[in-house]
């Protein structure tokens, strides 16, 4: 029998309540050593999905706190085991004391993600669903939440299962033909086999194409705000972040360090970096900031290139445009509240999207959000349809796709059907690894060590 485990499942911060979760064959026995209900009914006598008010007591009979106990009976629980959740007042000290009482009563400390790991091992979810649970916990926006929720309810798993079923039909026919050549087994129709393989390829290609976009919503985009000094970069940073994150003055060269903030724009988390104004300078401190700005441009996933429309284009503006030729970027013609002296058409010719904006007043912010939505192609992302969440899933899907492409090539070149069979079976193994049907304990350990304790 697995040991009974316990952990604090609420955040390590003061709050309205704190929850200690207990799971395992001895969950009721352990909890009953700590909890006394006002009704006098023991937890082991309660039905699943019921609650009782009471208190938590030390072995000496001293009351620690008022507590509500929630009972879940296996297998109809999150972990598939008997589960008790004890809710107390949410002070850090109080919750830790309650956990210690539970551990002293016989429970073992839970490791990272151990509750969800048990749910996986007990067949309550597959590995892809478990990783989606982690996605729900870490979701920083609406699209990421929707994708994670869909994954946790099995949408991705059902997609993978559909691909597998199509390939299993092909593999079964190939195996029957190879194993019983003298029996009355229909000949393999190579045209139908080729079509089945290509259908699997298409489905996997669609999943892989959605991975980068899904990651964009989960992890955000490294976004650099760049431009020459006093173009309004820091004012834009403050506008987007909703507070004064960067110092703004009338003097050029005020920003010297890289100032960072994550903001939500057009539904996408932008990991903003406000950099020093790019120019030649004799100031040794400012030159370090300028060098850091140039380095950030090389690794940026998106650049907001800010130009001061109240001034004519200068050498630094042209150099910035040259540096961004191969980088996804939006030109922001700033200071639209002032008379325009800049050749805006010259900028428009160099960028896919150009937005006129006043970072000082906020006018044009909606246009910037629209431009971001278009350049990032957010309208065609449908998170409820199921997306790949992790690099592990992406690698397994890519392995399956590569195997199918090899099988298609073998078929087209006229190689033996045995060679095609090996490729189809390799694809099936990769898909089984993706959902956790065939996966090593090392991989399982690696997945769940990313979780927090208590989940």
Predicted regions located by residue number:
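Short glycine-/polar-rich loops that comprise or flank the Walker A/P-loop
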Residues: 15-17, 49-52, 299-303, 326-329, ...
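Conserved beta-strand segments of alpha/beta enzyme cores
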Residues: 108, 269-271, 353
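A glycine-rich (often HGG/GG-containing) alpha/beta subdomain
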Residues: 1-146, 150, 154, 330
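C-terminal-of-GTPase-core extension/linker across diverse P-loop GTPases
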Residues: 2-8, 12, 142-264, 281-283, ...
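Short, acidic/hydrophobic/Gly-rich beta-strand patch recurrent on exposed beta strands
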Residues: 21, 237, 274
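Inter-motif core of Ras-like GTPase G domains
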Residues: 286-310
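Glycine-rich, N-terminal phosphate-binding loop of Rossmann-like dinucleotide-binding domains
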Residues: 88-90, 240, 275, 307-310
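Switch I (G2) and immediately adjacent beta-strands of P-loop GTPase domains
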Residues: 52-65, 69-73, 253-281, 299-302, ...
